[in-house]
C-alpha cells in the first residue's frame, strides 16, 4: 500500500508560502532573504507549459508541477528534507529546469555563509521522482543547466568571507562527477571573475545563460555561459555611465535573438551583439522575445500563489488525490564527487 501524507499540513504550508513574505533564508545565493520556492520556475511557453514549485511542509518538501493555464496541479510529491527552487541572480530569476523539460534541480536552502557542505537533488521533472542526490564539500550555488539536463553548472565560493570570489564548475549528471577545471574565458588572461550576480536571462533554446555581474567595484560585465560546450565569455560593459544603479539593470534578448539588451527601468542602456560580442550604446530596441522564465514574487504571491492555495484546498476537502511520499534511501548519491577533466 502506497504511504501518504496528510493533506492538511500541505494546505497550511502552501497557504503560508503564498501569503507570507519570503522566509529568512536563501536558496543558494550567498546572502539571506531570497527564496523562489513559492514562485517557482516555468517551462518554455507552449501548450503544456508548467510551473514547478517547492514548498516546506514540516521537515519535508512538497514539490509540485502546476499548469500555467488554469492552475491545475498536474503532479506533486513529498520529499524528505528541505529543498527549494534555486535562484540564479538577485533579481529573483529562477533556474534548475532544463529547456527540454525533463530535469529539475532543487537545492538545500542556505542558512549561513559559508556552509561546509551543499546538497542538491536532481528530479525527473515529469514524475518528480528523485534521480540523484548530490552532496558537495564546500559552499556552492546553482548556476545553470544544459538543455537536456546532462550538465549542471555550480558557482563554487572560494573565500569564507567574500562571496564575490568564486569559480564556475561543471557537473556531469550521468557520471556524478564534478569537473575540477573551472570554466573561464580563455581570453581573460588569468584575470579572475568577481562580483554579485544581479540579473539573468537565457537564450530561447536554453543553451546560453547570460548573467549580469556588478564587478565587485570594478567594471560590470556579462558572463555568457555555453552550457553545451562548457565554455564561457566575459563581456565587459565599459559603456555603463558612472553612478548607474547597477542593481536596477535587467537583461533581455531582442526579438530576432541576435542582441542581448541591458536596460534599466526606463529604457535600454547597452546592447551586445551575440555573434561578435561587441557592446554598443542602445538605440531603438524591439520588444523582448517571449516572456521571462520567472515572475515577480509579488505578482505570484498575490495571484497565482493564491490560486495554488485554492486548488490545494479543494484537493484537501475532497481527499481524492494524495501525493507520493518519497524516501531518498534508494536514490543514487554523489558525495564529494571525484574531480576529473
What do these predicted regions represent?
Residues 68-70, 124-128, 173-176, 226-230, ...:
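Short loop/turn segments that connect beta-strands within beta-propeller blades
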Residues 33-45, 83-96, 138-147, 188-201, ...:
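Repeated scaffold domains used in trafficking and secretory/extracellular systems
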Residues 28-35, 72-87, 129-135, 177-191, ...:
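A short beta-strand motif characteristic of beta-propeller blades
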Residues 56-60, 109-114, 157-162, 214-219, ...:
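Short glycine/acidic-enriched loop and turn motifs that connect beta-strands
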Residues 322-341:
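Cytoplasmic C-terminal tails of single-pass
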Residues 48-50, 100-102, 148-150, 205-207, ...:
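Short coil/turn segments that connect the beta-strands within blades of beta-propeller domains
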